[in-house]
Amino acid sequence: MRTEIADALLRAVLPPWAVGAARADDVSGPLFAVERALCEGAGPRREGEFTTGRWCAHRALVRLGGSPVAVGRGPRGEPLWPPGVLGSITHCPGFRGAALCRAGPARALGIDAEVDAPLPARVRDRLISTDEAGRMRPEVAGERLLFSAKEAAYKACSALVGDGRVPRLAELRILVEPGRHGPGTSGRFRVRVPALTVDLDGRHFEGRWKRSHGLVLTSCVILRPGTEVPRAWRPGTEVPTAQG
């Protein structure tokens, strides 16, 4: 897969006011010194995932209107972005990507990429509810879409709340909009979170998905209540925030 195709696949699941960068193959760098230290001792596969994920992050920062800076790692393994920037990194066999937006209408952003294949039965039974799975049939590997959507939503949630308050994947309920869900299609999804989850409201989750080129890609944005999200903003500029 060419880099421009990987870029287009990621762009297809992002809101118009977010940017991304992706590629299918690994690169050897460059990395900032602090980033290089984070992958010391890693095996070749993990080093390739990490290095290429950071390469995508640097490229996305430029597309957002900034300059490449070191993307560190937080206590939960999450990427650490510059002030005022929200983002997420994902990787799976044949795909690495990073997506960013500026804080404002958005409170958090998560993305996920998966190989479009059926979930192992033990994973499906543990994480996908009967109701969720029933909505996707008879589409082949529809449960992989549900799993990816949960991963994207989980990443967005974990950016807002501490480890002990993040809903488990099994607790996140994904409602995919009606329509075709098979390979070559795309659409939206909604997220339901546990009623007692502090600081999260499923009404403010915006999810997008695409199945193409043997992959499932998803994104989930948590929006700020009471904020009208613009259709787009010019990269590198500040975005309006809710008053009060």
Show where each model-derived region lies:
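Core catalytic alpha/beta fold that binds nucleotide/phospho-ligands
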Residues: 1-244
